[in-house]
Amino acid sequence: MKLRASHLLGISILLICQSVYALDGRLSATLGLDYSSGDYGADQDTDVWATPISLKYRTDTWNIRASTSYLRVTSPNFVTPDGDFIGTGNATATKRVTEEGIGDLNIAGTYNLLDDRKYLVGLDVSAKVKIPTADEDKFLGTGKTDFGLNAEMFQSYGDWSPYWNVGFKWRGDPKGFNLKNVWSSSIGTDYRINDRFNMGVGYDWQQKTTQFSDNAQEASAYVNYKVNDNNKVNFYVLGGFSNASPNWGSGLVLVHYL
């Protein structure tokens, strides 16, 4: 499962694909439940339950978000929830261990350089930091700080809102392991069905982080329901196409505007 800075895939899609401008500033909170499962090239599956939470403050031109999650991971004890191979590297391990605890803290700030209402495309730039609050001894994280930069282009054409982004992440190196700095990219589109419903699809790619792993590749689809002006519900499914991604996953995200 990829607990990326867009933070959980469903949250990322939900927040990216909607062109909502808050002139006076607005605070929102999210709570989710996510499950994913994959073998990551091993003989045994890694199963991850996550309960992500986040707070986001947004104005017309910038936003800042802090997010974390509570994790329950059952795995051969060498794959983190990010799909990084940092344990024994023994892909034939037969014993699975269950660990749980708080995940890493992710903080991201985004600035709108180009307003999509005024220009051919909209352009957002983001800076991100992962603070290692997850227990590395339980393989819930790497125990190191990561930094990232991201640029995203988007525009609305009637009911369609396509987007494309590219990012680079500087990885901290756990002792004894060489995690590579990586490029990543995502492409997708949102479709507005009516005033209450929108749906969309997306594809995510990321360079491999270690010599033992592959490039991560995932496709996803989601449906978003606007309960009222203050509450939204998002349901998503995803499938992976490499040993660095889960075989499949699904989740539910609740968003409340304060």
Spans of model-derived segments:
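Cleavable N-terminal export/targeting peptides
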Residues: 1-26
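Transmembrane beta-barrel domains of Gram-negative outer membranes and organellar outer membranes
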Residues: 22-173, 182-249, 253-258
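Active-site cleft segment of glycoside hydrolase catalytic domains centered on the general acid/base Glu
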Residues: 177
